[in-house]
Amino acid sequence: MLQEFLDADTVVIGVALYNFTISTQLKAWIDRVLVAGKTFRYTAEGALEGLAGNKRMILAVARGGRYGEGSPTAALEHAETYMRAALGFVGLHQPEVVVAEGLALGPEARAAGMAAAQAQIDALPV
């Protein structure tokens, strides 16, 4: 799994918001990818250095509710923020993020959330 990650030019990660954070399965994957000496290291001065290289990272985030910026529940969103921190730890500081939210708030909200996500996908560079 680690070598596949290191060899990849582009990595797309599905990130569902479960109880304000990521799933245990995604956490297990992160634990296998954040490996000292392989994807990060500490310099002699104690500074962190990411070793994951220059890859394109795309996070596809799904949320049943609305947790985006400006939402009353935004402070409870710890999936996208966690993934940004974990990827930054290995030197991948600018993931592209597609968010579908409001998916559990009824058919109209779901359709709007999916349409917004599709627009974000369409705007990604090829």
Predicted regions and their residues:
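Helix-loop-strand module that forms the ligand-binding subsite of alpha/beta enzymes
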Residues: 2-75
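Glycine-rich phosphate/pyrophosphate-binding loop and the adjoining helix
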Residues: 69-126
